[in-house]
Regions:
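Asp-based phosphoryl-transfer active-site loop
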Residues: 1-11, 218
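Conserved SAM-binding loop
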Residues: 6, 31-34, 55, 180, ...
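Active-site phosphate-binding/coordination module
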Residues: 10-115, 229
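Mg2+-dependent phosphoryl-transfer enzymes with acidic/Ser/Thr/Gly-rich catalytic loops
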Residues: 14, 179-261
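Hydrophobic packing residues within well-ordered alpha-helices of enzyme cores
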Residues: 17, 42-46, 156, 160, ...
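Short active-site oxyanion
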Residues: 28-32, 51-53, 142-143, 203-204, ...
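Short, structured coil segments at secondary-structure junctions
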Residues: 49-51, 59, 163-166, 220-221, ...
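Conserved acidic, metal-coordinating active-site core of Asp-based
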Residues: 87, 92-208, 214-215, 229
Length: 261
C-alpha cells in the first residue's frame, strides 16, 4: 500500500525506504505496489523509487504490467453509477464532496473545497477536472470516493450500502475518505492475479496496509502487517495480525530489513 503505509504523512517515499526496496529487489525479492490511487500518479511514485514493477491501482480495479500494458480492468457496473449519482450526499454533511476516477482522470462534482485546494499544493497533485453529476453518470467509472468528516461519512456509508444492496465495495480507506468500487475488485484478487503469472503462491507473500481497502490483502497473504497508524476498523478486523510502527517511522522498510536483509 502507498498512502499511510509506504508513503510518509507528507506523501513521499523516504530515502531509507527507497534504498531498502532497491536492495531487496537486487536480491531477487519481488516487490509490488497496490493502491487506491490511479495509474499515472502511482507510476510517478514508482519512478521516484527507481524501480519498474507491475502496478495495482484503484483498489485492485486496474492492473498494469511494468511496460504499462493494461492487464485487466473492473470498472463499476453501469447500473450502479446512476444510482450513486442520484444520492443527495450533501444531506449528510455540507462539507462532503464527490470524486470519481475515469481511467487516470480525477473528476470532482461541483467544485473543489478550499481546504482540498490547499492539500493539492501541499502534496503536489494535479488539479482535478470539474464535471456535473449528470455528465459523470454517463462515464465509465473505476471508483467513486467521498471526502468529508468521518461522522457524516458514516451516515452516507449506510445509504450507499442500501443503494448497492451489498453488490459494491463501500470501504473507508481513511477516516475522511469513503470509497465505492466494483465488488469483484480488491487488492487481494489483483495480487493473486499477478502472483499466479509469476508462479508464486499467496502464502509466500507479505503485505503492508493501513486502510480497510487493505483488509482482504492483509488477510489472504502469508503475512499481513498492520501499520501503527491504521484506520481503527482495520485493526479491529485483524486482531491477530502483527502491528508495526507508523508510516512516518519507515516501519515497512524496517520490517523488510528484518525479513529479507
Amino acid at each position: 500500500d502507498l498512502d499511510g503505509t509506504l508513503l510518509t504523512s507528507n506523501r513521499v517515499v523516504s530515502e531509507f525506504s527507497k534504498e531498502i526496496i532497491n536492495k531487496i529487489m537486487d536480491k531477487g525479492i519481488k516487490f509490488y505496489i497496490a493502491t487506491g490511487r490511479v495509474y499515472a500518479n502511482t507510476k510517478e511514485i514508482m519512478e521516484s523509487i527507481g524501480i519498474e514493477v507491475p502496478l495495482i491501482t484503484s483498489n485492485g480495479s486496474r492492473v498494469n504490467d511494468k511496460d504499462e500494458t493494461l492487464l485487466y480492468s473492473n470498472p463499476i457496473e453501469k447500473k450502479f453509477i446512476n444510482d450513486i449519482c442520484e444520492i443527495d450526499y450533501k444531506k449528510h454533511g455540507e462539507e462532503i464532496f464527490l470524486n470519481a476516477y475515469i481511467d487516470d482522470d480525477w473528476i470532482v462534482s461541483g467544485h473543489l473545497p478550499e481546504k482540498a485546494e490547499i492539500k493539492l499544493e501541499e502534496w503536489n497533485l494535479d488539479y482535478p477536472m470539474i464535471m456535473p453529476l449528470n455528465e459523470i453518470a454517463t462515464k465509465e467509472i473505476s471508483k467513486f470516493f467521498y471526502i468529508g468528516e468521518h461522522e457524516n461519512l458514516l451516515k452516507l456509508e449506510r445509504e450507499l450500502l442500501d443503494v448497492s444492496n451489498g453488490e459494491l465495495n463501500v470501504v473507508f480507506v481513511s477516516p475522511d475518505c469513503l470509497e465505492v468500487f466494483n465488488l469483484k475488485s480488491n487488492k487481494a484478487n489483483a495480487i493473486r492475479f499477478i502472483l499466479e503469472r509469476e508462479g508464486i503462491e499467496m502464502s509466500e507473500a507479505v503485505a503492508f496496509g493501513d486502510g480497510f481497502n487493505d483488509y482482504e490483502m492483509l488477510q489472504e497473504v502469508g503475512k499481513g502487517y498492520v501499520m501503527g497508524n491504521a484506520f481503527y476498523r482495520l485493526s479491529e478486523a485483524l486482531p491477530d495480525n502483527e502491528v508495526i510502527g507508523t508510516c512516518d517511522e519507515d516501519a515497512e522498510a524496517k520490517k523488510l530489513v528484518e525479513l529479507f536483509l
